[in-house]
A protein has these predicted regions:
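Short beta-strand/loop element within the Bergerat-fold HATPase_c
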Residues: 116-127
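Glycine-rich ATP-binding loops of the HATPase_c
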Residues: 168-181
Length: 190
């Protein structure tokens, strides 16, 4: 187990306890204490609350968090997002899928040696719920027979599997494009 995997494993274990404690504080109306608990145990909250990317609170929070992470890494974000409020279940599932795609893009762009560090994000809900993320990349991206990227590294490729799982469970189509140093993934509900 690598050091990063060990750290992540510990973090996941501890997070269950942190969230249980936090849930109890909120249930008891201890909002100030919960806020201080978050700052202490989860880390400083980014100053992203003023950014409004879309009307859906879950999706907006996800976009704010991942775009702030990209900014910290010196990555420019080109985003055009036009999403209305989704149902609670749809919002959660769509948010996880988008987060996986954006996280993969951040990881890929962070590896670039030149100054082409940017990510393009598009999301709309009309005529159908659609999402795309694209980014420059270096190196070779391996794909399977269906054109889906695959990773030979242990512990990598789970984000792609999550995107495929979202598509399967939500009657959505996906398309991965890899050409001329540009990688993109598009997901659209049928």
């Amino acid at each position: 187990m690598t050091e990063a995997e060990k750290t992540l494993s510990i973090y996941r274990h501890d997070m269950r306890h942190i969230l249980t404690t936090l849930s109890g504080m909120i249930s008891d109306g201890l909002y100030d204490e919960a806020d201080h608990f978050i700052e202490k145990h989860i880390g400083p909250i980014e100053e992203t609350s003023h950014a409004k990317w879309c009307e859906d609170g879950v999706l907006n929070s996800m976009f704010c968090a991942y775009f702030a992470e990209a900014k910290k890494r010196g990555i420019e974000i080109d985003a055009q997002i036009d999403l209305k409020r989704l149902s609670e279940d749809e919002s959660a599932m769509f948010s996880i899928m988008c987060a996986n795609a954006i996280e993969n893009a951040i990881h890929a762009v962070s590896q670039l040696s030149d100054k082409r560090k940017f990510i393009r994000v598009r999301a709309v809900c009309f005529p159908k719920l659609m999402f795309s993320v694209g980014n420059p990349y270096e190196g070779n991206i391996k794909t399977n027979d269906e054109g889906v990227p695959v990773s030979g590294e242990e512990g990598h490729g789970i984000g792609i599997l999550s995107i495929l799982d979202y598509c399967e469970k939500n009657d959505a189509m996906y398309d991965f494009k890899i050409e001329d140093g540009w990688f993109s993934v598009r997901v659209a509900k049928r």
